[in-house]
């Protein structure tokens, strides 16, 4: 190893040692999270009014049936699978913010197959249903002197 390579590696090693030897400063929770929650007032200036609702619903059914007769003899197979998934999220801020979120899924399926030496029959059925509903409002402060 020549002298130039040795000096370069030595300098890199010293810089790495300096960087790793620094102490980590304590950070506030606000800085660590990278976000701060805004303060709201109840007098109207700076008050936050929002209502958010999301919902997702999905259903799936796979039904498969097979009946066959081949030289080795009759055979049959069937397969059925049903999946449902629902999720919802509700966010409400400020005065009188209301949100409701409902989600429902249903999946049903059946499959059957039968064979004899002379005939083969197969049947497959599937039903799915999904429903989602989101309702939300964020009422503003009523004006003085007005009655509803």
Swiss-Prot record:
Residues 123-148 are annotated as: Disordered. Residues 123-132 have a biased composition (Low complexity). GO terms for cellular component: apoplast. Keywords: Signal. The keyword Ribonucleoprotein does not apply. One of its GO terms (biological process) is seed coat development. Residues 1-21 form the signal peptide. Belongs to the UPF0540 family. This is UPF0540 protein At1g62000. It comes from Arabidopsis thaliana (Mouse-ear cress).
């Amino acid at each position: 190893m020549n002298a130039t390579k040795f000096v370069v590696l030595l300098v890199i090693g010293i810089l790495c040692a300096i960087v790793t030897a620094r102490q980590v400063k304590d950070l506030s929770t606000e800085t660590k999270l990278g976000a701060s929650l805004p303060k709201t007032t109840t007098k109207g200036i700076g008050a936050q009014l929002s209502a958010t609702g999301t919902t997702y619903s999905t259903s799936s059914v796979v039904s498969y049936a097979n009946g066959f007769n081949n030289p080795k003899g009759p055979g049959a197979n069937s397969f059925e699978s049903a999946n449902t998934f629902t999720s919802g999220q509700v966010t409400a801020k400020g005065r009188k913010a209301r949100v409701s979120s409902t989600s429902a899924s249903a999946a049903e399926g059946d499959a059957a197959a039968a064979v004899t030496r002379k005939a083969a029959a197969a049947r497959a059925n599937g039903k799915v249903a999904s429903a989602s509903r989101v309702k939300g409002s964020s009422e503003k402060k009523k004006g003085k002197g007005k009655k509803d």
